[in-house]
């Protein structure tokens, strides 16, 4: 998974082409850390069609607010720089994330 920061988010996600999944997480978020291995497994299956990335929101608070990330974990899918779907908090389960990814490939 490509580790985003406030400097690379613009080029990798907002100016990117195709589908990009962003895992918004933080070190203090236990559900985020529990979900991460599942997301990494999905990358092995769907990584050809969707670019998998993650952003530690504690290092990019303003960016998270700008992207309307109101709770963690938030898993968002962008297409050609536009956010097209997201799952937040309790909805961000491995099964729901995989279903969301499959919807767009």
Swiss-Prot record:
<feature type="disulfide bond" description="Redox-active">
    <location>
        <begin position="29"/>
        <end position="32"/>
    </location>
</feature>
<dbReference type="InterPro" id="IPR036249">
    <property type="entry name" value="Thioredoxin-like_sf"/>
</dbReference>
<dbReference type="Pfam" id="PF00085">
    <property type="entry name" value="Thioredoxin"/>
</dbReference>
<feature type="domain" description="Thioredoxin">
    <location>
        <begin position="1"/>
        <end position="105"/>
    </location>
</feature>
<dbReference type="GO" id="GO:0015035">
    <property type="term" value="F:protein-disulfide reductase activity"/>
</dbReference>
<comment type="function">
    <text>Participates in various redox reactions through the reversible oxidation of its active center dithiol to a disulfide and catalyzes dithiol-disulfide exchange reactions.</text>
</comment>
<keyword id="KW-0676">Redox-active center</keyword>
<keyword id="KW-1015">Disulfide bond</keyword>
<dbReference type="InterPro" id="IPR013766">
    <property type="entry name" value="Thioredoxin_domain"/>
</dbReference>
<comment type="similarity">
    <text>Belongs to the thioredoxin family.</text>
</comment>
<dbReference type="GO" id="GO:0005737">
    <property type="term" value="C:cytoplasm"/>
</dbReference>
<dbReference type="InterPro" id="IPR005746">
    <property type="entry name" value="Thioredoxin"/>
</dbReference>
<keyword id="KW-0249">Electron transport</keyword>
<keyword id="KW-0813">Transport</keyword>
<dbReference type="InterPro" id="IPR017937">
    <property type="entry name" value="Thioredoxin_CS"/>
</dbReference>
<protein>
    <recommendedName>
        <fullName>Thioredoxin</fullName>
    </recommendedName>
</protein>
């Amino acid at each position: 998974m490509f580790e985003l920061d406030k400097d690379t988010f613009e080029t990798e996600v907002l100016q990117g082409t195709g589908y990009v999944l962003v895992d918004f997480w933080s070190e203090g978020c236990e559900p985020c850390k529990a979900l991460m291995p599942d997301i990494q497994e999905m990358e092995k299956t769907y990584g050809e069609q969707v670019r998998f990335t993650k952003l530690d929101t504690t290092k990019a608070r303003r960016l998270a607010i700008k992207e309307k990330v109101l709770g963690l974990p938030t898993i968002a899918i962008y297409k050609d720089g536009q956010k097209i779907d997201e799952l937040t908090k309790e909805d961000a389960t491995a099964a729901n994330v995989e279903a969301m990814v499959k919807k767009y490939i």
